[in-house]
């Protein structure tokens, strides 16, 4: 059999407790949700769902082609302008996913002969971007500007440092100001993925780069996703107009991919406009994360202090993490379960995502369920 080796890998996963399965969710779930990335609770907001429905009625179910052919609607342009303005950048480019946005930014901005300095804790999409880039990649220790500075000092020619702004496993924030200084000293660019910062950090949720004073910096490029705080789907790259124009002409995941569906664009626009009107949602998401961490720690659990909306609780083994998450589900609570290879240090975790719309009673219930089922 051509794919007989798959059976061996499946058995190895089973022995290691690393089997993953799909679990379709119903339209109306009875579970309290601390597993999704709907940080601001906007995915089902009437303005967001109506934005999606109206866009589909007006523009159709799909984009019908790549962005360079028929896949760019007037709605795409609106979202790009409003997103760039909200985050404080000159220009923006919408792609079909946050994954595609990261591939676009890294591959198009790391040409042959360049150096890419990548944080050891980066998301898989940034790692894949580094693998596909024509430059040479050097992985440096996690959240270490001095290591970035040292790596950049060994190279002559184009260079970029690449990092998440908020790391998805433990929810810790990157030292963006320090990274920017290291890049500036060596004339390097900085590419950061703000998937977990947009809508949560910065003034009114404008993102981690905005909070660090890097919004609009000509040497900083930011990628974001529309599928977390904005409750939709898709991704975008933000930066100087010259960089965005370069991506339009050089980024393969933009050029050769079908444009983002109008419904997703409409939903993201609705969420972005709602966030502008209700900036307190960002602060509330952070408050909920802090409350979860404080109370879980008080229960004797090993919870990592959150810098944004992700709260990580360490488990003793992959098998125990799976059982713990399953027990929580049986008790009416949905939590994330992260195991190798999704965790960079090999330590399995429950991952909780704080939501701005959680009540005090729901926070207490979640902590009680997690603690009782440890």
What residue ranges belong to the model's regions?
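Conserved PLP-anchoring active-site segment centered on the Schiff-base-forming lysine
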Residues: 105-124, 145
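N-terminal "arm"/small-domain region of PLP-dependent enzymes with the aminotransferase-like
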Residues: 2-61, 188
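Amphipathic alpha-helix from the class-I
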Residues: 265-283, 294-301, 317
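PLP-dependent enzyme catalytic core of the Aspartate aminotransferase-like
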Residues: 42, 46, 50, 54, ...
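Active-site phosphate-binding strand-loop segment of PLP-dependent enzymes
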Residues: 138-192
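Conserved PLP-binding catalytic core of the aspartate aminotransferase-like
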Residues: 5, 286-290, 297-332, 342, ...
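Conserved N-terminal alpha-helix of the aminotransferase class I/II PLP-enzyme fold
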Residues: 50, 55-97
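Active-site PLP attachment segment
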Residues: 210-246
């Amino acid at each position: 059999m051509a794919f007989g080796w798959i059976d061996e890998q499946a058995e190895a996963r089973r022995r290691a407790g690393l089997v993953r399965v799909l679990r379709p969710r119903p339209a109306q779930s009875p579970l309290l949700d601390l597993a999704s990335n709907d940080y601001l609770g906007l995915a089902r907001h009437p303005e967001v769902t109506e934005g999606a429905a109206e866009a589909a009625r007006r523009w159709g179910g799909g984009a019908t082609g790549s962005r360079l052919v028929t896949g760019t609607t007037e709605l795409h342009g609106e979202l790009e302008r409003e997103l760039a303005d909200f985050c404080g950048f000159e220009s923006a480019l919408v792609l079909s996913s946050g994954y595609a946005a990261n591939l676009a930014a890294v591959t198009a901005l790391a040409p042959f002969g360049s150096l890419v300095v990548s944080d050891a804790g980066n998301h898989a999409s940034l790692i894949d971007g580094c693998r596909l880039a024509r430059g040479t990649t050097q992985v440096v220790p996690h959240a270490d500007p001095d290591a970035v500075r040292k790596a950049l000092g060994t190279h002559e020619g184009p260079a970029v440092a690449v990092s998440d702004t908020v790391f998805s496993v433990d929810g810790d924030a990157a030292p963006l100001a320090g990274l920017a200084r290291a890049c500036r000293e060596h004339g390097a660019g900085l590419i950061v993925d703000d998937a977990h910062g947009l809508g949560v950090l910065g003034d009114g949720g404008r993102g981690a780069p905005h909070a660090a004073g890097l919004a609009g910096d000509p040497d900083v490029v930011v990628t974001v996703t529309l599928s977390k705080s904005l409750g939709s789907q898709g991704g975008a790259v933000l930066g100087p107009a010259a960089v965005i124009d370069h991506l339009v002409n050089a980024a393969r995941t933009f050029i050769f991919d079908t444009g983002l569906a109008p419904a997703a664009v409409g939903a993201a626009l609705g969420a972005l406009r709602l966030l502008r009107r209700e900036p307190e949602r960002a602060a509330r998401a952070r408050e909920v994360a802090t409350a979860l961490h404080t109370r879980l720690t008080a229960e004797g659990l090993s919870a990592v202090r959150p810098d944004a909306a992700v709260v990580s609780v360490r488990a003793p083994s992959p098998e125990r993490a799976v059982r713990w998450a399953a027990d929580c589900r049986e008790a009416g609570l949905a939590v994330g379960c992260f195991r190798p290879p999704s965790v960079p240090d090999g330590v399995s975790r429950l991952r909780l995502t704080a939501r701005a719309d959680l009540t005090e009673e729901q926070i207490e219930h979640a902590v009680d369920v997690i603690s009782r089922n440890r």
